[in-house]
Amino acid sequence: MKKICKSGILLILLFAAVSMVYGQSIGISGYVRNYTGVLLTGDYNYAIIQNTFNLNFEETKNKVGFKVNPYVYHYQNQETEYGLRQAYLDLYFDAFDLRIGKQQIIWGKADGVFITDVVSPKDLSEFLLRDFDEIRMGITAVKADYYIGNNTFEFVYVPVFTPTRMPDQNSIWYPAPQFSPNAEFDYSKSQVENKLSNSEVFAKFSGLTSAIDFEIMAGYMWDDDPAMHMLRTVDPATQEPGLTVMPEYHRIGLAGGSFSTTIKGVVLRGESAYYNGKYFSSADPAAAEGVTEKKYVQYLIGLDYTLWGVKVSGQFIQKVILDYDESIVNDQYENMATILLSKDFLRETLRAELFSYIGLNNSDALIRPKITYDLADGFELLLGANIFTGDKGMFGRFDKNDMAYFKLKYSF
Protein backbone atom coordinates (compact mmCIF):
# COMPACT_ATOMS: atom_id res chain seq x y z
CA MET A 1 0.00 0.00 0.00
CA LYS A 2 2.84 2.41 0.81
CA LYS A 3 4.35 1.77 -2.62
CA ILE A 4 1.01 2.50 -4.30
CA CYS A 5 0.58 5.74 -2.34
CA LYS A 6 4.12 6.82 -3.11
CA SER A 7 3.62 6.12 -6.80
CA GLY A 8 0.34 8.00 -6.85
CA ILE A 9 1.83 11.05 -5.14
CA LEU A 10 4.74 11.13 -7.57
CA LEU A 11 2.41 10.91 -10.55
CA ILE A 12 0.21 13.71 -9.19
CA LEU A 13 3.23 15.95 -8.63
CA LEU A 14 4.54 15.17 -12.08
CA PHE A 15 1.35 16.02 -13.91
CA ALA A 16 0.76 19.05 -11.68
CA ALA A 17 4.14 20.36 -12.76
CA VAL A 18 3.19 19.87 -16.41
CA SER A 19 -0.09 21.72 -15.87
CA MET A 20 1.58 24.68 -14.18
CA VAL A 21 4.16 25.29 -16.88
CA TYR A 22 2.10 24.40 -19.93
CA GLY A 23 1.52 27.40 -22.12
CA GLN A 24 4.22 29.47 -20.46
CA SER A 25 7.71 30.22 -21.73
CA ILE A 26 9.23 27.10 -20.22
CA GLY A 27 10.15 24.56 -22.89
CA ILE A 28 8.59 21.12 -22.53
CA SER A 29 9.83 18.09 -24.43
CA GLY A 30 10.04 14.37 -23.89
CA TYR A 31 8.86 11.04 -25.15
CA VAL A 32 6.62 8.06 -24.48
CA ARG A 33 8.04 4.67 -25.44
CA ASN A 34 7.10 1.02 -25.39
CA TYR A 35 10.01 -1.43 -25.43
CA THR A 36 9.26 -5.14 -25.79
CA GLY A 37 11.91 -7.83 -26.18
CA VAL A 38 11.69 -11.61 -26.58
CA LEU A 39 14.47 -14.12 -25.88
CA LEU A 40 15.42 -16.24 -28.90
CA THR A 41 16.32 -19.31 -26.83
CA GLY A 42 14.38 -21.74 -24.66
CA ASP A 43 10.66 -21.00 -24.39
CA TYR A 44 10.95 -17.55 -26.02
CA ASN A 45 10.21 -15.76 -22.79
CA TYR A 46 9.92 -12.00 -22.69
CA ALA A 47 13.28 -10.42 -21.92
CA ILE A 48 11.67 -7.08 -21.17
CA ILE A 49 8.32 -5.29 -21.35
CA GLN A 50 8.93 -1.67 -20.46
CA ASN A 51 6.88 1.52 -20.82
CA THR A 52 8.80 4.76 -20.46
CA PHE A 53 7.65 8.32 -19.87
CA ASN A 54 10.45 10.88 -20.07
CA LEU A 55 10.03 14.65 -19.62
CA ASN A 56 12.30 17.66 -19.99
CA PHE A 57 11.50 21.10 -18.57
CA GLU A 58 13.98 23.75 -19.73
CA GLU A 59 14.30 27.51 -19.75
CA THR A 60 17.08 30.03 -20.23
CA LYS A 61 16.40 33.68 -19.45
CA ASN A 62 18.98 36.44 -19.23
CA LYS A 63 21.81 35.10 -17.07
CA VAL A 64 20.09 32.05 -15.62
CA GLY A 65 18.57 28.79 -16.77
CA PHE A 66 17.44 25.43 -15.52
CA LYS A 67 16.59 21.90 -16.63
CA VAL A 68 14.56 19.20 -14.90
CA ASN A 69 14.35 15.68 -16.38
CA PRO A 70 12.03 13.28 -14.51
CA TYR A 71 11.32 9.82 -15.90
CA VAL A 72 9.16 6.77 -15.23
CA TYR A 73 9.95 3.15 -16.14
CA HIS A 74 6.91 0.88 -15.88
CA TYR A 75 7.44 -2.90 -16.01
CA GLN A 76 4.93 -5.72 -16.31
CA ASN A 77 6.13 -7.80 -13.34
CA GLN A 78 8.38 -5.38 -11.47
CA GLU A 79 7.97 -2.32 -9.32
CA THR A 80 7.56 0.89 -11.31
CA GLU A 81 10.73 2.99 -11.21
CA TYR A 82 10.59 6.77 -10.79
CA GLY A 83 13.66 8.92 -11.08
CA LEU A 84 15.18 12.30 -11.71
CA ARG A 85 17.92 12.03 -14.30
CA GLN A 86 18.80 15.73 -14.20
CA ALA A 87 17.76 18.75 -12.16
CA TYR A 88 20.18 21.66 -12.32
CA LEU A 89 20.52 25.44 -12.41
CA ASP A 90 22.72 27.36 -14.85
CA LEU A 91 24.37 30.70 -14.12
CA TYR A 92 25.99 32.56 -17.05
CA PHE A 93 28.73 35.16 -16.72
CA ASP A 94 30.90 36.96 -19.25
CA ALA A 95 33.74 34.44 -19.33
CA PHE A 96 32.42 31.43 -17.44
CA ASP A 97 29.34 29.34 -16.72
CA LEU A 98 28.28 27.59 -13.54
CA ARG A 99 26.00 24.55 -13.39
CA ILE A 100 24.79 23.32 -9.99
CA GLY A 101 22.63 20.27 -9.34
CA LYS A 102 22.03 16.79 -10.67
CA GLN A 103 23.49 16.46 -14.16
CA GLN A 104 24.97 14.11 -16.73
CA ILE A 105 28.56 14.94 -17.67
CA ILE A 106 29.98 13.46 -20.89
CA TRP A 107 33.68 13.53 -21.71
CA GLY A 108 35.85 11.89 -24.37
CA LYS A 109 35.62 10.90 -28.03
CA ALA A 110 34.86 7.17 -27.78
CA ASP A 111 31.62 5.57 -28.99
CA GLY A 112 30.15 2.98 -26.64
CA VAL A 113 33.30 2.78 -24.50
CA PHE A 114 34.12 4.61 -21.25
CA ILE A 115 37.79 5.64 -20.97
CA THR A 116 37.90 9.30 -19.91
CA ASP A 117 34.09 9.45 -19.74
CA VAL A 118 34.14 8.60 -16.03
CA VAL A 119 32.43 11.49 -14.25
CA SER A 120 28.88 10.15 -14.56
CA PRO A 121 28.58 6.57 -13.26
CA LYS A 122 26.91 3.88 -15.36
CA ASP A 123 23.54 2.17 -15.03
CA LEU A 124 24.24 -1.42 -16.12
CA SER A 125 20.93 -2.86 -14.92
CA GLU A 126 20.35 -3.92 -18.56
CA PHE A 127 24.03 -4.52 -19.31
CA LEU A 128 25.04 -2.19 -22.22
CA LEU A 129 21.67 -2.35 -24.01
CA ARG A 130 20.09 0.91 -22.87
CA ASP A 131 20.53 4.08 -24.88
CA PHE A 132 23.67 5.83 -23.69
CA ASP A 133 21.77 8.86 -22.41
CA GLU A 134 20.05 6.36 -20.09
CA ILE A 135 23.19 4.40 -19.18
CA ARG A 136 24.89 7.55 -17.88
CA MET A 137 23.45 8.35 -14.48
CA GLY A 138 22.93 11.87 -13.26
CA ILE A 139 25.04 12.99 -10.30
CA THR A 140 24.81 15.99 -8.00
CA ALA A 141 27.78 18.18 -8.88
CA VAL A 142 29.10 21.69 -9.36
CA LYS A 143 30.51 22.23 -12.85
CA ALA A 144 32.35 25.41 -13.83
CA ASP A 145 33.44 26.24 -17.40
CA TYR A 146 35.88 29.07 -18.06
CA TYR A 147 36.33 30.21 -21.67
CA ILE A 148 39.44 31.67 -23.30
CA GLY A 149 38.91 32.06 -27.02
CA ASN A 150 38.30 28.58 -28.46
CA ASN A 151 39.64 26.93 -25.31
CA THR A 152 37.72 25.83 -22.23
CA PHE A 153 38.81 25.00 -18.69
CA GLU A 154 36.28 22.77 -16.93
CA PHE A 155 36.21 21.90 -13.24
CA VAL A 156 33.80 19.43 -11.65
CA TYR A 157 33.23 18.89 -7.94
CA VAL A 158 31.15 15.86 -6.90
CA PRO A 159 30.33 15.91 -3.17
CA VAL A 160 28.80 12.42 -2.91
CA PHE A 161 30.02 9.18 -4.48
CA THR A 162 27.61 7.18 -6.66
CA PRO A 163 28.67 3.65 -7.69
CA THR A 164 27.81 1.69 -10.82
CA ARG A 165 24.27 0.38 -10.74
CA MET A 166 24.36 -3.38 -11.28
CA PRO A 167 21.51 -5.73 -12.33
CA ASP A 168 19.30 -7.28 -9.67
CA GLN A 169 20.13 -10.86 -8.73
CA ASN A 170 16.98 -12.15 -10.46
CA SER A 171 17.80 -10.33 -13.71
CA ILE A 172 18.98 -12.19 -16.82
CA TRP A 173 21.85 -9.66 -16.90
CA TYR A 174 23.13 -10.52 -13.44
CA PRO A 175 26.63 -11.96 -14.01
CA ALA A 176 27.18 -15.54 -12.87
CA PRO A 177 28.84 -15.63 -9.41
CA GLN A 178 32.60 -16.15 -9.60
CA PHE A 179 32.71 -17.52 -6.07
CA SER A 180 31.69 -20.86 -4.56
CA PRO A 181 27.97 -21.24 -3.70
CA ASN A 182 28.88 -21.40 -0.01
CA ALA A 183 30.59 -18.02 -0.01
CA GLU A 184 29.30 -15.47 2.50
CA PHE A 185 29.21 -11.74 1.83
CA ASP A 186 30.26 -9.05 4.28
CA TYR A 187 29.08 -5.60 3.16
CA SER A 188 30.45 -3.71 6.17
CA LYS A 189 33.06 -1.94 4.00
CA SER A 190 30.92 -1.45 0.91
CA GLN A 191 29.66 2.03 1.81
CA VAL A 192 31.49 5.28 1.12
CA GLU A 193 30.50 7.81 3.77
CA ASN A 194 28.96 11.10 2.68
CA LYS A 195 31.59 13.49 3.96
CA LEU A 196 33.80 16.22 2.52
CA SER A 197 36.96 14.11 2.43
CA ASN A 198 35.20 11.54 0.22
CA SER A 199 34.36 14.04 -2.51
CA GLU A 200 35.50 13.59 -6.12
CA VAL A 201 37.16 16.26 -8.27
CA PHE A 202 37.83 16.42 -12.00
CA ALA A 203 39.44 18.95 -14.33
CA LYS A 204 39.59 19.17 -18.11
CA PHE A 205 41.13 21.48 -20.71
CA SER A 206 39.51 21.50 -24.16
CA GLY A 207 41.15 23.05 -27.20
CA LEU A 208 39.72 23.62 -30.65
CA THR A 209 41.82 24.60 -33.66
CA SER A 210 41.33 24.38 -37.40
CA ALA A 211 43.37 21.15 -37.42
CA ILE A 212 42.41 19.29 -34.25
CA ASP A 213 39.92 19.10 -31.39
CA PHE A 214 41.49 17.80 -28.18
CA GLU A 215 40.94 17.37 -24.44
CA ILE A 216 43.29 16.83 -21.49
CA MET A 217 41.75 15.66 -18.22
CA ALA A 218 42.53 14.45 -14.72
CA GLY A 219 40.52 13.21 -11.79
CA TYR A 220 40.70 12.04 -8.20
CA MET A 221 37.71 9.77 -7.71
CA TRP A 222 36.36 6.52 -6.36
CA ASP A 223 36.44 3.42 -8.51
CA ASP A 224 32.79 2.97 -9.48
CA ASP A 225 33.16 -0.82 -9.22
CA PRO A 226 34.09 -2.47 -5.91
CA ALA A 227 37.13 -4.70 -5.44
CA MET A 228 36.16 -8.14 -4.15
CA HIS A 229 38.31 -8.71 -1.08
CA MET A 230 38.26 -12.33 0.09
CA LEU A 231 38.94 -13.89 3.46
CA ARG A 232 39.49 -17.66 3.47
CA THR A 233 38.79 -19.53 6.70
CA VAL A 234 38.61 -23.11 7.99
CA ASP A 235 35.86 -24.26 10.35
CA PRO A 236 37.74 -25.60 13.42
CA ALA A 237 35.03 -28.18 14.12
CA THR A 238 34.44 -29.62 10.64
CA GLN A 239 37.66 -28.52 8.91
CA GLU A 240 35.46 -27.32 6.05
CA PRO A 241 36.95 -24.38 4.11
CA GLY A 242 34.98 -21.15 4.11
CA LEU A 243 35.06 -17.96 2.07
CA THR A 244 33.93 -14.46 3.02
CA VAL A 245 33.69 -11.92 0.20
CA MET A 246 33.99 -8.26 1.21
CA PRO A 247 33.18 -5.72 -1.54
CA GLU A 248 35.07 -2.47 -1.00
CA TYR A 249 35.42 0.74 -3.02
CA HIS A 250 38.85 2.33 -3.41
CA ARG A 251 40.21 5.70 -4.39
CA ILE A 252 41.64 5.94 -7.87
CA GLY A 253 43.52 8.68 -9.69
CA LEU A 254 43.58 9.11 -13.43
CA ALA A 255 44.93 11.37 -16.14
CA GLY A 256 44.19 11.19 -19.83
CA GLY A 257 43.09 12.89 -22.96
CA SER A 258 41.37 12.56 -26.31
CA PHE A 259 41.53 14.08 -29.77
CA SER A 260 39.68 14.20 -33.06
CA THR A 261 40.93 15.40 -36.44
CA THR A 262 39.96 15.06 -40.10
CA ILE A 263 42.42 13.87 -42.73
CA LYS A 264 41.17 13.83 -46.35
CA GLY A 265 37.59 13.14 -45.34
CA VAL A 266 38.48 10.52 -42.72
CA VAL A 267 37.90 11.36 -39.05
CA LEU A 268 40.68 10.05 -36.81
CA ARG A 269 39.86 9.79 -33.10
CA GLY A 270 41.95 8.77 -30.12
CA GLU A 271 41.50 8.54 -26.38
CA SER A 272 43.63 7.23 -23.52
CA ALA A 273 43.84 7.28 -19.73
CA TYR A 274 46.30 6.22 -17.04
CA TYR A 275 44.71 4.84 -13.87
CA ASN A 276 46.50 4.64 -10.52
CA GLY A 277 45.18 2.59 -7.60
CA LYS A 278 43.03 -0.09 -9.26
CA TYR A 279 42.58 -3.31 -7.28
CA PHE A 280 42.51 -6.60 -9.23
CA SER A 281 41.57 -10.07 -8.00
CA SER A 282 44.60 -12.31 -7.52
CA ALA A 283 45.08 -16.07 -7.19
CA ASP A 284 48.33 -15.55 -5.29
CA PRO A 285 47.93 -17.11 -1.80
CA ALA A 286 50.22 -14.39 -0.46
CA ALA A 287 48.00 -11.58 -1.78
CA ALA A 288 46.29 -9.85 1.12
CA GLU A 289 42.54 -10.60 0.94
CA GLY A 290 42.93 -11.94 -2.60
CA VAL A 291 43.52 -8.58 -4.31
CA THR A 292 46.53 -6.67 -5.58
CA GLU A 293 46.88 -2.99 -6.43
CA LYS A 294 48.16 -2.10 -9.90
CA LYS A 295 48.29 0.73 -12.38
CA TYR A 296 46.82 0.31 -15.84
CA VAL A 297 46.44 2.11 -19.15
CA GLN A 298 43.46 2.05 -21.48
CA TYR A 299 43.46 3.59 -24.94
CA LEU A 300 41.41 3.72 -28.12
CA ILE A 301 42.03 4.59 -31.75
CA GLY A 302 39.08 5.07 -34.10
CA LEU A 303 38.29 5.93 -37.72
CA ASP A 304 35.05 7.35 -39.16
CA TYR A 305 34.31 7.77 -42.85
CA THR A 306 31.50 7.57 -45.38
CA LEU A 307 31.68 5.12 -48.28
CA TRP A 308 28.92 4.99 -50.94
CA GLY A 309 26.52 6.66 -48.55
CA VAL A 310 27.30 4.22 -45.73
CA LYS A 311 28.69 5.65 -42.50
CA VAL A 312 31.52 3.38 -41.38
CA SER A 313 33.15 3.63 -37.96
CA GLY A 314 35.69 1.34 -36.34
CA GLN A 315 37.49 1.42 -32.99
CA PHE A 316 40.26 -0.64 -31.40
CA ILE A 317 40.45 -0.57 -27.60
CA GLN A 318 43.18 -2.03 -25.42
CA LYS A 319 43.59 -2.19 -21.65
CA VAL A 320 47.08 -2.93 -20.29
CA ILE A 321 47.87 -3.78 -16.66
CA LEU A 322 51.31 -2.43 -15.75
CA ASP A 323 53.83 -4.38 -13.65
CA TYR A 324 51.74 -7.48 -14.34
CA ASP A 325 52.11 -10.79 -12.53
CA GLU A 326 50.60 -14.10 -13.64
CA SER A 327 48.51 -14.54 -10.50
CA ILE A 328 46.16 -11.69 -11.52
CA VAL A 329 42.81 -13.07 -12.68
CA ASN A 330 42.49 -10.52 -15.52
CA ASP A 331 44.57 -10.82 -18.69
CA GLN A 332 47.46 -8.40 -18.94
CA TYR A 333 46.18 -7.21 -22.32
CA GLU A 334 42.44 -6.97 -22.88
CA ASN A 335 41.60 -6.20 -26.51
CA MET A 336 38.27 -5.19 -27.99
CA ALA A 337 37.00 -3.67 -31.22
CA THR A 338 33.76 -1.99 -32.26
CA ILE A 339 32.25 -1.64 -35.73
CA LEU A 340 29.39 0.63 -36.80
CA LEU A 341 27.69 0.59 -40.22
CA SER A 342 24.78 2.95 -40.86
CA LYS A 343 22.83 4.09 -43.92
CA ASP A 344 19.69 6.19 -44.48
CA PHE A 345 16.97 5.39 -47.02
CA LEU A 346 13.64 6.84 -48.19
CA ARG A 347 14.63 10.48 -47.77
CA GLU A 348 16.15 9.79 -44.36
CA THR A 349 12.96 8.29 -42.91
CA LEU A 350 14.46 4.79 -42.73
CA ARG A 351 17.81 3.98 -41.16
CA ALA A 352 19.57 0.61 -41.12
CA GLU A 353 22.35 0.21 -38.57
CA LEU A 354 24.70 -2.47 -37.33
CA PHE A 355 26.80 -1.93 -34.21
CA SER A 356 29.03 -4.64 -32.77
CA TYR A 357 31.33 -5.07 -29.80
CA ILE A 358 33.98 -7.72 -30.52
CA GLY A 359 36.01 -9.23 -27.68
CA LEU A 360 39.35 -10.25 -29.16
CA ASN A 361 40.68 -12.15 -26.13
CA ASN A 362 37.78 -14.61 -25.85
CA SER A 363 36.38 -14.50 -29.41
CA ASP A 364 33.03 -13.27 -28.12
CA ALA A 365 30.82 -10.46 -29.39
CA LEU A 366 27.61 -8.48 -29.04
CA ILE A 367 26.02 -7.86 -32.46
CA ARG A 368 23.23 -5.26 -32.58
CA PRO A 369 21.40 -4.83 -35.91
CA LYS A 370 18.45 -2.46 -35.97
CA ILE A 371 16.13 -0.64 -38.37
CA THR A 372 14.49 2.66 -37.44
CA TYR A 373 11.52 4.02 -39.39
CA ASP A 374 9.84 7.41 -38.93
CA LEU A 375 6.15 6.51 -39.13
CA ALA A 376 4.94 10.09 -38.82
CA ASP A 377 5.98 13.37 -37.29
CA GLY A 378 7.34 12.40 -33.87
CA PHE A 379 6.48 8.69 -34.22
CA GLU A 380 9.34 6.22 -34.55
CA LEU A 381 9.37 2.44 -34.89
CA LEU A 382 12.55 0.52 -34.15
CA LEU A 383 13.11 -3.19 -34.84
CA GLY A 384 16.31 -4.77 -33.62
CA ALA A 385 18.16 -7.70 -32.12
CA ASN A 386 20.93 -8.32 -29.60
CA ILE A 387 23.00 -11.36 -30.53
CA PHE A 388 25.69 -12.65 -28.16
CA THR A 389 28.38 -14.99 -29.46
CA GLY A 390 31.03 -17.04 -27.67
CA ASP A 391 30.81 -18.93 -24.39
CA LYS A 392 32.94 -16.79 -22.09
CA GLY A 393 34.18 -13.25 -21.74
CA MET A 394 32.31 -9.99 -21.30
CA PHE A 395 29.74 -10.86 -24.00
CA GLY A 396 29.95 -14.65 -24.28
CA ARG A 397 28.70 -15.11 -20.71
CA PHE A 398 25.29 -13.88 -21.95
CA ASP A 399 25.12 -16.30 -24.89
CA LYS A 400 21.66 -17.51 -23.79
CA ASN A 401 20.29 -13.94 -23.77
CA ASP A 402 19.93 -13.44 -27.54
CA MET A 403 16.83 -11.35 -28.07
CA ALA A 404 14.70 -9.62 -30.69
CA TYR A 405 12.85 -6.46 -29.78
CA PHE A 406 10.82 -3.52 -30.98
CA LYS A 407 10.44 0.01 -29.67
CA LEU A 408 7.57 2.34 -30.49
CA LYS A 409 8.37 5.92 -29.49
CA TYR A 410 6.54 9.22 -29.69
CA SER A 411 8.65 12.33 -29.11
CA PHE A 412 7.23 15.79 -28.45
Where are these regions (language model features)?
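Outer-membrane beta-barrel "beta-signal"
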Residues: 379, 400-412
